[in-house]
Amino acid sequence: MKPLTLKFITVFTLLLFAAPAWAWHDKTHLAAAKAGGLDSWYNAAGPDLAKIKAGNIESYNHWFNNNAEAEVTVRMVMDQIGRYNQRNKELDSEGHLYGAILASLRAYEKDLRTGKYARYHLAYCVHYLADLSQPLHNIAYDDFNQAFHDRNDGIVESVILDQPHLITRHMYRITLGDETFEEDLAREIARIANLSRYLGYRLRAEKRLMTREEACVQLGHSASLIRAVLRRYP
């Protein structure tokens, strides 16, 4: 087989498993942001709107396909930071959700230091933190993921904004140190990512949707980490 043909097949395969995925639906994102304490929670669905014009520059911030089914580590999270708002399909075919969380906070701090309005960066961060708990944003975008993704995104959409207790009853305290904030946050991102992908594998093995209770437990993880982040960025 000619090298050029082999390269084409390799790239095509990577792109196939990197097809755009959506996210929790709008009211679900708003509910997670509100439960986590974001005062401008009404902005939390905005990053999905941004995909319409920004395309893959934004969409790759929303998922990590983890085709190798590897354990998510602090190092993996940190290594993704530099890919934020990038769209290199060949070298970054799996997305970089985990790094986007930290990178959006760095962008917030940068704009704050230069006197710019920085709060929109928090809305991006909170959105990514909610995506972190969507199981199908943490596993390969395979046939199962494609078939079940949208329905999983909307599993609690009709009730969650009006019934915040469905999330808050699953929240717990997460502590992020002042001096070790990024490392602590990366550790928590990895922890929740692993919980999410394990659930994703179970859903795939059983060929089913999340239950509403499973979705609310997942959103509780996200809202708990949102609340911890906002203690530093009130």
Language-model regions, residue ranges each:
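Bacterial N-terminal signal peptides
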Residues: 9-17
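N-terminal, motif-rich segments that launch catalysis or mediate targeting to/interaction with membranes
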Residues: 19-120, 138-234
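Short alpha-helix carrying the canonical HExxH Zn2+-binding catalytic motif
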Residues: 118-126, 130
